[in-house]
Amino acid sequence: MSQDRLPQMVISIMLLANFDVSERCNIRPRSFDLIAKKGDNLVIIKVASHIDSVSADITWDLNLIARYLEATPLIVGERARDTDLERGVVYIRYGLFALNPETLYDYFVEGLSPMVYASPGGLYVRIKGDLLREVRERFRMSLGDLASHLGVSRRTISKYESGMGTTLDVAIKLEEIFNAPLVETIELLGYRTPEPEKHLESTPGDVLADLERMGMEIHAMRQAPFQALALFDRHTILTAYGTSQKIVKRASLIGNISQITKTFAMCVVTDYKKQKKIGKTLLIGEEHLHTLEDGSELIDMINE
């Protein structure tokens, strides 16, 4: 089966949902495959047939890029361990949402939010705790009464009312008892990843150190097509660096991604002494970069 089938399916779904979609990232290693934008919603997507192949380094990049671009990170795949991903179910990989293409289609094209999430032990849903308490009291039913109906403890009912997840069977029984929609939907676009742990990343060569000298906040990537996010005065610069042979393959892709994400793109070339633009991407020699005094000079050059 073609390796392009799944990525092309994901691209088609996002286009069908009227998203602008970036060029597909074909550079290895890569922590994401495409970025899509519609209005204020920005989605960064990693496509992997088997979601267990998505490493901690990949999710580190996805988390970091999503946080600083105010995007939603998603993993789209077909299998986990030895089973197919189920339609309408959200899985978790290193804290990020993972789902199959059908669930992606249902959410972005049909507007149907998933309700079920996979966790060790099976499939679960999250209960609307405040609503459960409200309808239970309206029915004049005590914690003990409801616990007896469900065959669980009073403490468990109290936890449901605090938002604890439960099995599908219990959720169905609750909705039948009270005739109320008690299950929370999972809003993929509203999801924000946890604050990443602070790690001192190594900065190969002098390029990132030079950018820091110019007053920029630097976040090094591990497997992204750009090696760093450089932040300066409300501007974000997708930054790659290396020899001209390596950079030429990245310049166009990074420029395309910057257009979708409304950011800047820059490639620092270690064996080049001048500067020029390839599309929206600034190519600047490492020696030339070293002569700049602060980030505003670099922003002006990118804007030229």
UniProtKB/Swiss-Prot annotation:
InterPro entries found in the cross-reference section: Arc_TR_HTH, Cro/C1-type_HTH, Lambda_DNA-bd_dom_sf
Keyword Membrane: no
Cross-referenced Gene3D superfamilies: lambda repressor-like DNA-binding domains
SMART domains, per database record: HTH_XRE
CDD domains named in the record: HTH_XRE
Source domain of life: Archaea
GO molecular function: DNA binding; DNA-binding transcription factor activity
Entry-linked HAMAP family: HTH_type_cro_C1
Protein name: Putative HTH-type transcriptional regulatory protein Memar_2347
Source organism of this protein record: Methanoculleus marisnigri (strain ATCC 35101 / DSM 1498 / JR1)
Lineage: Archaea, Methanobacteriati, Methanobacteriota, Stenosarchaea group, Methanomicrobia
